[in-house]
Every structure is written in structure tokens, then in C-alpha cells.
Amino acid sequence: MSEQKLALNEYLKTDSDYLRGTIKEGLDSSVTGSFSDGDQQLIKFHGFYQQDDRDLRNERKEQKLEPLYSFMLRARVPGGVCTPKQWLGVDEIASTLTSSNSIRLTTRQTFQYHGIPKRNLKTIIQGLDREALDSIAACGDVNRNVMCNPNPVESKLHAQAYEVAKKLSDHLLPHTRAYAEIWLDEEKLLTTEDETVEPVYGKTYLPRKFKMAVAVPPDNDVDVYTNDLGFIAVAENGELVGFNLTAGGGMGSTHGEVETFPRLADDFGFIKTEDVMKFAEAVMTVQRDWGNRTNRKRSRLKYTIVDHGYEKFKAEVEVRAGVKFEPKRDVVIGDRGDRYGWVEGVDGKWHLTLFIESGRIKDMPGKSLQTGMREIAKIHKGDFRMTSNQNMIIAGVAPEDKATIEGLARKRGLLGQVLTQTRGHSIACVALPTCPLAMAEAERYFPEFIDHIDALQAKNGISDQAIVVRMTGCPNGCARPFAAEIGLVGKAPGRYNLYLGANFEGTRLNKMYRENIQEAEILAELDALFARYAIERNAGETFGNFTVRVGVVKAVIDAAKDFHG
């Protein structure tokens, strides 16, 4: 039997001269606002995606114009930490070089810009570089932005975990100089044919995207089990001693294709802090060598582990790391939400967590969020920490500066909104009009949808109960909907699949309850379930656990068998 043909992206990567392609030539062309099909795949490794305004597609087609192309650029910000000075630079770019005039906090602790014309890409990347920021490897078949729990209470432990996250990000960056040459005008260095340009990735990089997170228990705001590779911090006497390693998580799937499914990571065991890089590289290189390069829908690490088996994968990782896993340590994983308002850290500094609905920082009628963040950045002496729930922490505030910071936040609408438990635990992806994959609305519709959920909870007397609700416009799962107690995944305009049964802590997936239904049906189903939950729930029982216990949906134990079955 002949070998299967590789996926097209594999040939593109091989022939790209380490991610250069013809990006430079495409950038210089003013004939079109787009890049060539091949370069559209390669620019992802540089941190951005080509998009167009789908609200205007038909109108422009009638006018015989090409789509209104623009680009979404995502920064690499390990652990979501940036300085006020950097934020002012980020804000200036958003205000002057993008059509969206906004900054979007993501579900992976970074920010992205929408509505960038091709002519502004280079200026933006050079502007980020002046602030010691970049977008390399924020997208593409590489290790993406490394998440780390911002944990503003245990400052010392957070600092130790953050250093690990930053080292992971730096160590696993692509070594190619394509980014520096194309965007920063650095000269191309001559290399010999046999020189190793990419010691970890090789010429074809990874089969697919690779996501990594560092969690600091008891918090699980990074949703560690949804990542390809996770490190759960283990502390003794307040000091970091190592991590429980998890591998094989991932949210993406394809509607109607049962061979694709979301999956939560497996626990592999405890590793010492000094061995983190060895194990990270080992897991990545096993995926590099064993991952599926013929079918991109089956190319994530989760499928590699399912197809080759847990024990075989674990043994190979240990061989490559040169270290054996120890038995995993007992840790408690709990809340995935953020602590809103003021929290005092162990160092006496204060941290203010701001709720940013769907992560969109923009000046709007009645709320000048972007102006407020700018004003705070001008006087703040600590740092900013973006969370994986799309929120912002004003971190490291001295006691004497609290009143000033809070005053600015309240004045500009960053503080003071009525925030229900459920709204504070809920996130949505961008979806329409810019995401080319979206089948339905998410960010634009989500606030209204949560209003309905809040009303139903109030009606049924369960407003005190936080429920994790997430919405995406497609099944790629950017807002991790399959790990939500209530997950809504776009199927068509105004229609969603409704998923129930994940647990509150993020250690069990949900399962489809109703397919392809509209708002009225969704709300009717949830109203009936909330009524039952109010009466039948056990003491302390969360909504997701309730739906499994009473048989509304079956628990997903083994995603490969249970998610669709």
C-alpha cells in the first residue's frame, strides 16, 4: 500500500525556507489587500491571520470589489504579564493603526488587534518590537502563547511559576530569522545547507498547533486540562518544587465528523522543576515525529496519544527526557474564575481584577474602557496581567495608590457594573464578522444571551450559583466551550449546539444535549433544567454535576468513545 499523501501545509512548510515563503513580496504588492494562498498559511507563524469583513462581503461582491481584507494580529505575552509602558505602546497602535480601534484580550492571556490593513502590518510589528513585544509563534504549527495562572494572592509562588512559563516560551520559540528579516529589516544571515536552523522543530515544524499552560492550584483559570501540555505547580512550604505534568488536551473538533472530538489531558506524573524543559521538549518532539501529517483534522497531540496509546507515548517521552515520571502529587484543582475587585497579596501590594466583557477594550457610549486603561497605565507603578478569562488585573498597587486607581476605573466604566456569578465565569470567542470560520455569532451576541441566563437564574432562585457558560461561533473551540457547564457552539446563523455536563473545575468534558437549536429553544430547555436544579440539587452540587447525576446527559469519561456516543 502506498504512503498517504501529506497535508498541503506540510509541503508549504517544507518549501518555505523556514517560514519566509513569498511573504515579503506579498507585503510589497499594492495590487491586492491579501496574501497568496500559501503565504496565508505561513503568516500565521508570524502571528497573524488574514480575514475580511463578512458583514460587507455581499455588498462588495455586487460592487465587483475584492473582499475588504484585513488582518488579526496576536501578540506573544507569556503568562499575560506586561508593563504599563508596554500597554501604552499597545494602546497607541490600536488607536492609530487598526480600523477596530480596540484591543481584544484573548482566552490565552494575550491581546490581539483586529482590522489591520496589510500596509500597516510592518509598522505594527516594529511598534511592538520597540516595546520588547512580538507576535512570533502566536499562531501556526508551533508552541503558542504559554499561559500561567496570575494568582494575585500567592505572589511568590506566582512569580516562580511565571518564570517557568516564560522560560518555556523562550526555549520553544522558532529559531528561524524570517520574522526579524521580513518585519524588522534585519539582514539575512548566510547559512550552510547542513546547518540546523530549527533544533527542536525541524524543517516542517509541528503537525498542528501546540498549546501549553502552567497552573497554580487551587486555581484552574488557565483550564490546564484543555491544553496539549500542562504543568500543575506543586509547592512545599510555599516554595515551588515541581509539577504534575498533563498532556493530550485540546478543544477543536468538526461538526459531523465523529473521528474528531475535544479531549482533556491525561495525568502523566510528577516532575522536578529542573526537568521541565527536558519534558517539554520531549513531549513536543514525540508529537513532531509521531503526529499525523496527512490529515490536519487528526493532527493534534490528543489524537497522537489516542492512536499510539498512553503507555507507549509515556515511555517514549521518558526516553527522550532521560528522566522517569514520579507518581503524581496530590493537588486540589478548583475554581476557573477570576477574583474580581481588590485582593491583597502576601507582599502587602494590592491587585484589582477588572471584568472585561468578552475581552474587548474599547471606548463605547457610557464606558470608556480604552481611555480608562490608558489613564491607569500612565500612573500605575506595578504591572498588568491579562487572564485567560479575558479580564485584566491591575497588579502590584501600593496601598496609598488604591483610591486613585479605583477612581479612574470607576470613572471610565471599568468598575461598578453589576456582575452576576455566572457572567463572571463566562467567556466567548470573537466569531462574526471577522473570523472566517464562524458559523454563528458569539462575542456580539453573548452579553445579551447572558442577560437571559441571569434572568432565568433569578426566576428560579439560583442566582447565587456560578455556572460556567461559554459560546463559540464554530467547533474549533477557542473559548473552550466543551469544558463549560453550558456550552454553545455555532452551527448556523442564529443556531447552536447545546452542550451540558462538564464540571465546574474543568476536569470533565460536556456532551451534546440538543443540536442546531435557536435562542427560544435554548432558553426553554435551560429554564426547565434550572427549575429542576433549584428543587432537586444536593447541597453544594454544581449545575454540571447535577445534569450528569440526574441523567440529563451521560458523563464523558473517555472522549474518544463517549463524546459522540
From Swiss-Prot:
Subunit structure: Alpha(8)-beta(8). The alpha component is a flavoprotein, the beta component is a hemoprotein.
Pfam family, one: NIR_SIR
Source superkingdom: Bacteria
Protein name per its UniProtKB record: Sulfite reductase [NADPH] hemoprotein beta-component
Binding site for siroheme: C478
Catalytic activity: hydrogen sulfide + 3 NADP(+) + 3 H2O = sulfite + 3 NADPH + 4 H(+)
Cofactor, free-text remark: Binds 1 siroheme per subunit.
GO cellular component, one term: sulfite reductase complex (NADPH)
GO molecular function, one term: heme binding
EC number: 1.8.1.2
A GO BP entry: hydrogen sulfide biosynthetic process
Cofactor: siroheme; [4Fe-4S] cluster
Enzyme class name: oxidoreductase
Family matches, as HAMAP family: CysI (MF_01540)
Pathway: Sulfur metabolism; hydrogen sulfide biosynthesis; hydrogen sulfide from sulfite (NADPH route): step 1/1
Family: Belongs to the nitrite and sulfite reductase 4Fe-4S domain family.
Matches recorded under InterPro entries: CysI, NiRdtase/SiRdtase_haem-b_fer, Nit/Sulf_reduc_fer-like_dom_sf, NO2/SO3_Rdtase_4Fe4S_dom, NO2/SO3_Rdtase_4Fe4S_prot, NO2/SO3_Rdtase_4Fe4S_sf, NO2/SO3_Rdtase_FeS/sirohaem_BS
Biological role: Component of the sulfite reductase complex that catalyzes the 6-electron reduction of sulfite to sulfide. This is one of several activities required for the biosynthesis of L-cysteine from sulfate.
Keywords on record: 4Fe-4S, Amino-acid biosynthesis, Cysteine biosynthesis, Heme, Iron, Iron-sulfur, Metal-binding, NADP, Oxidoreductase
Binding positions ([4Fe-4S] cluster): C429, C435, C474, C478
